[in-house]
Amino acid sequence: MANKQDLIAKVAEATELTKKDSAAAVDAVFASIEEFLAAGEKVQLIGFGNFEVRERAARQGRNPQTGETISIAASKVPAFKAGKALKDAVK
C-alpha cells in the first residue's frame, strides 16, 4: 500500500523537484481540495475523478454494547468518485 511519503517521492521523481518541494506541492493540493469541499464546492479533475461532499440522512442506530436504539444525526461526509480514465487504468 502506498502512503503520502511514497506519493511525495513519485512527484519528486516525475518533476525533478526536491522531496521538500514535492511535499509542499502535495500538501498544497490536499489543503486546496479540503478548502473547496469545506466551502461546499465539488472538485472535478477530468480523467481522474470527482471529490464532493455527500449528506447522510439522520437515522436510527443501535448501541452494540447495550442494544439500545439511538438516534444518529445527519452529517456530511467527503466522497470520491473515480473518473473513466482512472477506472480504465486500474482494470
UniProtKB/Swiss-Prot annotation:
Gene3D superfamilies: IHF-like DNA-binding proteins (4.10.520.10). GO terms for molecular function: DNA binding; structural constituent of chromatin. SMART domains: BHL. GO terms for cellular component: cytosol. One of its GO terms (biological process) is chromosome condensation. Belongs to the bacterial histone-like protein family. PANTHER family: DNA-BINDING PROTEIN HU, DNA-BINDING PROTEIN HU-BETA. Homodimer. This is DNA-binding protein HU. The gene is hup.
